[in-house]
């Protein structure tokens, strides 16, 4: 029973590193590329934000909201290339396809830190709180955030099961 005290302290104070890239050697081109992105361009991660059934003016307001979130360096969208008053039918098809598909439009949120950094995952969480329904944040940073949240949600269950099984033995 006494061993549960240090086990509990260890459980509470142990931090899980979700940054898979931190385990790779510095000599890999992926690591070098990410370091260059962060050091020279001030960004290392991105997320695609898909917006469905939203008028252009509201999407422009949403873009501004996303840009105001901590650690979101920039948000790229249609209005960065063309004013929203220009009908989408007037722009070249390749540009239109890059931003629109049916009633959905895509924005690209650029973060000032790496894919699995705590600041990036916090920004993804904030984006998901701000956007509401019919807006979806995806990409590797979104996946890592989801994995982290699932692990944190399920870990107490596994710890309790392990504790009960150890009492049986």
Go through the PLM ranges and name each one.
Residues 1-167:
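Feature of extramembrane
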